[in-house]
Curated annotation (Swiss-Prot):
It is a multi-pass membrane protein. It comes from Ovis aries. D-glucose binds at Q161, Q282, Q283, N288, N317, E380, W388. Phosphorylation at Ser-226 by PKC promotes glucose uptake by increasing cell membrane localization. This is Solute carrier family 2, facilitated glucose transporter member 1. Pfam families: Sugar_tr.
Length: 492
């Protein structure tokens, strides 16, 4: 039975692969706005000239560009907070399928913005694709976590982050001036998102609905059993069904969990706090400052070909996500998150030193590249992939949609703050801007060390019962004490 449960079947690969196309969309739309900044700003200037007969004021251009970057996160905040409205009503798979309509609308708006001489169309398109991506960051980890066997849940959950970083890398390559990041083709660069949306529309109808949703939410045991047999590649799915039934019985003893209930109930208070702080540790680590403004950071560091250095960081990004994929089930979530936070803090200090001494020591530009590459690598070891799927692991079926909505909203809100404020904070702090992120990284390390339990190898119900047993006094317990009933290996 044990070896069978670990099997990576064709149907499971199809289900996860179809879902993470949404993750790729998220990554692509995060990274695509970076490289063509100058040509899009020129489009804004030309449009302004045609309307008002004068060049666009520099302050207005900065505001419009910051809005073009940050409006994506506003859409993401709205989308992430709406996850529960869809997944409980339409199911996990059907929700992902329906949301592709937003991607098609966004592609049309951004693709025809130049023809329509309207920067408003581009900004609206960025907002709509942001809503799509906000929903996706809830749908994909939830679906992947629910279709995956316990032994593969961490590795397959990391594929969400792998989809994101591959999307960022594709955006960086497509954004090269010699490919699509030029005066003529930038509308195509922004609208090419219709291709993964179309591909997902073709694949998802062949993917199964989440068996947990079918059994626990819809009480369709026969369908859930049939889906499990296909996903596991075996006729014996007794253990999975038994675990889901136990979780279903536990849900029936609980009243319906709303977002407010997550914060009122002692059983949910600690896991929701952990979920939110882990999401903040991802976004407030400074990683999106690197993603959004990497080209300009490399320019300031004196790098001759900054766009290629940016692509180099994208390759490092992807490579270390693959590393995380293979070690997450061995090393554990908590350990990797701690290593990632500590490494990023060290690289942020190096980056600060390199930028501060650049004028006196030109060779410091090379140190800045090493520091940024190291920063990105350590991010993908832990803070990149782990917050996405650990939220789904911390909660049982009942509170999971509400918890993912709260965690996603926290992620996108902090994403918005970084995207909107980094340019201004950088102007204020100069080369010392990454000291702010260093302090935050140290604080997140301390929180993770004292509060975050290990979830590796545990069923959803085992993890949730660990918090329930803590009850009202759980805030006084260490992760080891809180999860002691789950076995001696609760910490890695």
């Amino acid at each position: 039975m044990e070896p069978t449960s670990k099997k990576l079947t064709g149907r499971l690969m199809l289900a996860v692969g179809g879902a993470v196309l949404g993750s790729l969309q998220f990554g692509y739309n995060t990274g695509v706005i970076n490289a063509p900044q100058k040509v899009i700003e020129e489009f804004y200037n030309q449009t302004w000239m045609q309307r008002y007969g004068e060049p666009i004021p520099p302050a207005t251009l900065t505001t419009l560009w910051s809005l073009s970057v940050a409006i994506f996160s506003v859409g993401g905040m709205i989308g992430s907070f709406s996850v529960g409205l869809f997944v409980n009503r339409f199911g996990r798979r059907n929700s992902m399928l329906m949301m592709n309509l937003l991607a098609f609308v966004s592609a049309v708006l951004m693709g025809f913005s130049k023809l329509g001489k309207s920067f408003e169309m581009l900004i609206l398109g960025r907002f709509i694709i942001g809503v799509y991506c906000g929903l996706t960051t809830g749908f994909v980890p939830m679906y992947v976590g629910e279709v995956s066997p316990t032994e593969l849940r961490g590795a397959l959950g990391t594929l969400h982050q792998l989809g994101i970083v591959v999307g960022i890398l594709i955006a960086q390559v497509f954004g090269l001036d010699s490919i699509m990041g030029n005066q003529e083709l930038w509308p195509l660069l922004l609208s090419v998102i219709f291709i993964p949306a179309l591909l997902q529309c073709i694949l998802l109808p062949f993917c199964p609905e989440s068996p947990r949703f079918l059994l626990i939410n819809r009480n369709e045991e026969n369908r859930a059993k049939s889906v499990l047999k296909k996903l596991r590649g075996t006729a014996d799915v007794t253990r999975d069904l038994q675990e889901m039934k136990e979780e279903s019985r536990q849900m029936m003893r609980e009243k319906k969990v709303t977002i407010l209930e997550l914060f009122r109930s002692a059983a949910y208070r600690q896991p929701i706090l952990i979920a939110v702080v882990l999401q903040l540790s991802q976004q407030l680590s400074g990683i999106n400052a690197v993603f959004y403004y990497s080209t300009s950071i490399f320019e300031k560091a004196g790098v001759q070909q900054p766009v290629y250095a940016t692509i180099g960081s994208g390759i490092v990004n992807t490579a270390f996500t693959v590393v995380s994929l293979f070690v997450v089930e061995r090393a554990g979530r908590r350990t990797l998150h701690l290593i990632g936070l500590a490494g990023m803090a060290g690289c942020a200090v190096l980056m600060t030193i390199a930028l501060a001494l650049l004028e006196q020591l030109p060779w410091m530009s090379y140190l800045s590249i090493v520091a940024i590459f190291g920063f990105v690598a350590f991010f993908e070891v832990g803070p990149g992939p782990i917050p996405w799927f650990i939220v789904a692991e911390l909660f049982s079926q009942g509170p999971r949609p509400a918890a993912i909505a709260v965690a996603g909203f926290s992620n996108w809100t902090s994403n918005f703050i970084v995207g909107m404020c980094f340019q201004y904070v950088e102007q204020l702090c100069g080369p010392y801007v990454f000291i702010i992120f260093t302090v935050l990284l140290v604080l997140f390390f301390i929180f993770t060390y004292f509060k975050v339990p290990e979830t590796k190898g545990r069923t959803f119900d085992e993890i949730a019962s660990g918090f329930r047993q803590g009850g009202a006094s759980q805030s006084d317990k260490t992760p080891e004490e809180l999860f002691h009933p789950l076995g001696a290996d609760s910490q890695v």
